[in-house]
Design a protein with these regions (language model features):
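Membrane-anchoring hydrophobic helices of lipid-metabolizing enzymes
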Residues: 2-112, 118-129, 133, 155, ...
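Soluble catalytic domains of membrane acyltransferases
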Residues: 83-293
Length: 293
């Protein structure tokens, strides 16, 4: 894996949204191991067949396992290698293979803005990173919505895995413009410091399979270009945009997506349960997907 230097924390205007750097990895992992909600979530997923009392007795063993497995991770690249091991296992057990096209057209010494269709919350960027890594490219920084970060442990997990935060919760016009301006600036900053970026072509997954790029994404990206007084065409060219199309033979979340569309069509709205997005992430990783392309 190609190593890159971390961004300095001095005068770090992006600290609130950026992923963790090397110096922040080990403390973040320790916070995860000490987070009872995180441990409880693992117990509920891995040991759901056990009574609650017995799951509690297993908790110290889970912490010991995590400490042994993750305790030596002290850099962004070390985390990426560990994530690849989990992804290898997931792909071996839930898919019939992955086919990549176009990676040979990319320059290993160039940073790109990957704009992708969106089928699965976690697997979409994970698959692109998987292809990049196995082609000796640097892995990307990943844009994620703050709607996925309702728990501190979720924030820790995402930020140790090169994810930066898109503040979808910002609603007031001034707050929204400030958040979008910072996001646009961070994307350009990342590209200029040799870090590729992954971002979905529109907010949320395309639950009906209709892939199109939301003009709001392009407007957001261009905010930094306007600030620099660059022509639209000149600025977009400087971003080195790479369109990405991902297809799944089977979508593990297809029934949930269909139900959401049905509820919106018949009731006019759909209310997500508190942990529905997290459940979708887990199902997307662990359920059968057959072939990817």
């Amino acid at each position: 894996m190609i190593l890159k230097k971390d961004m300095s924390t001095e005068n770090d205007i992006y600290q609130e949204i950026r992923p963790y750097n090397d110096a922040e990895i080990a403390p973040a992992i320790q916070r995860l191991i000490d987070d009872e909600e995180f441990i409880s979530a693992i117990l509920s997923h891995k040991f759901s067949h056990l009574p609650a009392l017995l799951r509690g007795l297993v908790s110290p063993l889970v912490k010991m396992f995590l400490k042994n497995r993750w305790g030596k991770l002290d850099s962004v690249d070390a985390v990426q290698i560990e994530v690849e091991k989990y992804l290898d296992k997931a792909l071996d057990t839930t898919s019939d293979g992955v086919t990549f096209e176009g990676l040979d057209k990319l320059d290993k010494n160039t940073s790109y803005l990957f704009i992708s269709n969106h089928r699965d919350i976690a697997m979409d960027p994970a698959l692109v990173n998987y292809g990049l890594h196995h082609s000796q490219h640097q892995t990307m920084r990943i844009a994620i919505g703050d709607n996925l970060l309702r728990k501190p442990c979720a924030t820790e997990l995402m930020k140790i895995n090169k994810s930066f935060i898109v503040k979808r919760s910002a609603k007031a016009p001034r707050e929204m413009m400030k958040a979008l301006g910072l996001l646009s600036s961070y994307i350009k900053h990342s590209l200029e410091t040799s870090n590729s970026i992954w971002i979905a072509q529109k907010e949320g997954r395309a639950k009906d399979g209709n892939d199109f790029t939301d003009p709001a994404i392009i407007k957001m990206i261009q905010l930094e270009g306007r600030k620099r007084k660059m022509a639209f065409s000149e600025y977009v060219k400087s971003l080195k945009i790479v369109p990405v199309a991902i297809s799944y033979e089977y979508d593990p979340c297809d029934l949930a997506k269909a139900n959401e569309l049905y509820q919106k069509a018949t009731q006019g709205e759909y209310q997500k349960s508190e942990f529905e997005d997290i459940e979708s992430i887990v199902k997307g990783i662990t359920a059968t997907k057959a072939e990817f392309k």
